[in-house]
């Protein structure tokens, strides 16, 4: 039974990933049905950036740290339900992303699906989506009334701290 003494701090909480399904058909069909490109889906599945969970076959979008350890995960129902959220222990500074080195810019999205949709559009335009920094903010960012009181989203702060070459930030926010 949790007490004040044995509750771990946010930073100490381990990421609790759901059980991984041995198959990916449900997630693949869901993403393909949302218009995401076949090659992009396969890349994400092969790299375990996306997994299919059991028992509900949700799509789970995973973010990793520099040591390739999962530190963030968001789940989304693959049926008509609007069930979605972050897995327990998720650290938003490691949110879902497709990254390239030394591009000088980063593209920010509210969620993983928006990011994957943009990568698909880039491919349709003949651009190599692997050559861009595409990062999910892991939810909608809402600045304070006084902009000076606002904080930089943690995932962006961490990225800017780690990659000093970034000079341009492109926002892809739709507030849906």
Model feature map: region roles:
Residues 108, 167-176:
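Acidic beta-strand-to-loop metal/phosphate-binding motif
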